[in-house]
Amino acid sequence: MWCPTSSGSHLIRRGLLGAAIVCAGMAHAATDLSFESADAVNEGPLQFLVSLPAKPVHHHQNHIRIEPDSLASGWVSLSQCHDHLDAVPSAQITFREGFVRDLRVNAFSHIRDAWIEGSSVQLRQVEPGARLCLSAQIRALRNTGNGYFNLINGPYMRKFLDGYYPMRVTLAVDYPAQILTLLDITPSAQPGLGIVEQPGAIRMEAVFEGELQTMIQFERD
């Protein structure tokens, strides 16, 4: 897939689990009044932010459900929403081919049109305050052998040229606690990254600049 990255465009990428790449069309990409100036771009490594910026930022929300049969197949259920998408004439959310099925657009607002095209969601005329929700089956649970499993999510980024704008990510993972035990979450909780754990459920909330990738490790009981 071709993604413009010249001046006036911006690029948001996701990895295997959210597996989405959001490529905004070039024309008028920086005309949104809520779009931050280039001075706000962070060119350094991952940096967690202890508070949200004053202006609304892109909020990416993933809800993953691991079922008992996911351990054999690797397929998990994904519900995904995006709030405060940047205003652009066109964009697409693209999933890794062969790792997504049953992709659907469930709801959208402040977007003229949204439709499925292959393994992607195509967007047209994204306005300020846009919201998009979709669902799919994602092949994202990896069996690493000897009863261990990894769920890798990301990298998330809100990229502009060679730097990054602030982004908010919420990740919820539900898993069968009767057959899986949570071993570890990377990165660990810290200012700007909150993690809540209970048997069968994980909740993560991050505000950051840069590229964020998470890994959740399980052991089969």
List where the protein language model places each region:
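A surface-exposed beta-strand-loop module
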Residues: R104-L151, Q198-L212, I216-D221
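Bacterial N-terminal signal peptides
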Residues: R14-G25
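Bacterial N-terminal signal peptides that target proteins for export
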Residues: W2-L16
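Solvent-exposed beta-hairpin/edge-strand motifs
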Residues: V41-E43, A87-E117, L161-G192, E197
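Beta-strand-rich interaction surfaces with strong enrichment in secreted/lumenal proteins
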Residues: I64-D69, C81-H82, S120-V126, M157-K159, ...
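N-terminal, polar/Ser/Thr-rich
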Residues: A30-D69, L161
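Short, well-ordered beta-strand segments enriched in hydrophobic/aromatic residues
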Residues: V76-H84
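Surface-exposed, acidic/Ser/Thr-rich flexible loop segments
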Residues: S119-P191
